[in-house]
């Protein structure tokens, strides 16, 4: 297996859970290659997340690594209720009632609903998919609060399993009262990213942004906002959603249930491409290494799936139950590191830094991409961005190159946010307000970390005056003495 110390462009998001909540193990996982830790707000209480966030910060400090924290909101609970026996076995052809007014536990004839609006969202002929599409029901009739269905594809249905409508169309709002409280909790520990579940339009993300800004105001914090694309209705609005978000997550689970499994690979490629073109980050998620929940090695298909996402240009690949509840959380991270590194080593991305015909609207963006172009064609050892907000490093990272990007920033929050950017190694460094002194300090910093050595060429960008967000206006090509 490739050593976790190997340079790797693609970042790894790992979900924290019972299997990975021991501090020493979490530290090992961070050393092995975890760049972002996901806190799943579908489980646990507010204080649990506060405690886990503190544990992540402490583990990252011990490991000497920059790690971002992503708070993943639960979103609307579109689920069936509970059963008297905990589960039932539905047979094809059987009648089954989903009743929003039912109070008693469910049985073979029907079950209550957490989502009370379902009777108003469906009509006869609609197809409902339960438990990630493993059970399929056809709607026969809607009578008051009861949805009468026929089982088309049967199987075991247990407590609180999810409901999807084929083709989309459920009206549940993306943000619930619980989500609003959870945003306040996430801002109390200054989560670097907030992932919004089930957004359908840009308006959902704008509302989430406003809630985050209000909750974060007292901490002078600005989290990145990630839209989880998991509703069929979101696809036509993808460009608008991207425009008002900092990135997207290709959430293939619910999305596959709604649009059909066969449609997801092409949609994944489209979303990754659009995110990169619009200067946004993108995370590819769901069942990437699913078999490693119980097995010590991945399947060949899982290896190909992860490698394919890497070759598509995703910023990060995400582990969910594999690290939250699996038997082999550390081994899963190591396997994913190995797959990402080998996929990147085999790729030819030279044409991705050719900007012929591209126009730029901003000076700082022009400088960032000019440095990338020059470094690529000079065969530079490193590409260095002195950045206050992280924007320069983000623009550089939208284009795939084998040259590592080092982002030097005086702000801890910026350093952590850049942990998600593909091919960016964020480094914390205080610099002088004088440009020439700052450039000299940067070279000393790079040499001390063995990033560059005598004779190496590197490209570096900065702004004058120094420390002005969005003020990058200078590029310098240097040879180390």
Residue ranges and their predicted role:
Residues 1-481:
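Non-catalytic helical/linker scaffolds that mediate oligomerization, partner binding
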């Amino acid at each position: 297996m490739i050593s976790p110390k190997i340079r790797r462009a693609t970042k790894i998001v790992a979900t924290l859970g019972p299997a990975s909540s021991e501090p020493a193990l979490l530290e090992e996982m961070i050393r092995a290659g975890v760049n972002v830790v996901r806190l799943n707000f579908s489980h646990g209480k507010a204080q649990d997340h506060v405690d886990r966030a503190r544990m992540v910060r402490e583990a990252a400090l011990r490991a000497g690594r920059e790690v971002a924290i992503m708070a993943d909101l639960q979103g609307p609970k579109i689920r069936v209720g509970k059963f008297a026996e905990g589960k039932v076995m539905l047979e094809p052809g059987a009648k089954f009632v989903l009743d929003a007014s039912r109070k008693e536990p469910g049985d073979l004839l029907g079950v209550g609903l957490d989502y009370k609006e379902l009777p108003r969202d469906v009509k006869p002929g609609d197809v409902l998919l339960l438990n990630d599409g493993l059970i399929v029901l056809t709607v026969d009739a809607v009578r008051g609060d009861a949805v009468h269905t026929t089982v088309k594809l049967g199987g075991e249905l247990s407590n609180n399993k999810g409901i999807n409508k084929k083709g989309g169309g459920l009206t549940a709002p993306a943000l619930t009262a619980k989500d609003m409280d959870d945003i306040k909790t996430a801002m109390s520990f200054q989560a670097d990213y907030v992932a919004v579940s089930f957004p359908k339009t840009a308006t959902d993300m704008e509302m989430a942004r406003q809630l985050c800004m209000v909750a974060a105001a007292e901490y002078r914090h600005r989290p990145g906002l990630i839209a989880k694309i998991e509703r069929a209705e979101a696809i036509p609005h993808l460009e608008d959603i991207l425009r008002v978000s900092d990135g997207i997550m290709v959430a293939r689970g619910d999305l596959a249930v709604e649009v059909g499994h066969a449609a997801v690979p092409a949609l994944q490629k489209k979303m990754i491409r659009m995110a990169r073109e619009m200067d946004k980050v993108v995370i590819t998620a769901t069942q990437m290494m699913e078999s490693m929940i119980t097995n010590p090695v991945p399947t060949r298909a899982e290896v190909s799936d992860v490698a394919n996402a890497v070759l598509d240009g995703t910023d990060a690949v995400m582990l969910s139950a594999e690290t939250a509840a699996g038997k082999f959380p550390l081994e899963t991270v190591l396997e994913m590191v190995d797959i990402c590194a080998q996929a990147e080593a085999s790729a030819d991305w030279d044409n991705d830094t050719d900007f012929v015909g591209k126009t730029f609207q901003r000076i700082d963006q022009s400088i960032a991409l000019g440095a990338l172009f020059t470094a690529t064609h000079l065969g530079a050892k490193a590409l260095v961005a002195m950045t206050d907000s992280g924007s320069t490093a983000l623009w550089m990272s939208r284009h795939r190159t084998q040259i590592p990007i080092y982002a030097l920033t005086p702000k801890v929050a910026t350093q952590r946010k850049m942990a998600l950017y593909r091919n960016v190694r964020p480094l914390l460094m205080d610099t002088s307000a004088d440009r020439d002194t700052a450039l000299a300090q940067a070279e000393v910093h790079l040499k001390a970390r063995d990033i560059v050595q005598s004779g190496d060429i590197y490209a570096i960008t900065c702004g004058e005056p120094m420390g002005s967000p969005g003020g990058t206006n200078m590029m310098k090509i240097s040879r180390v003495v």
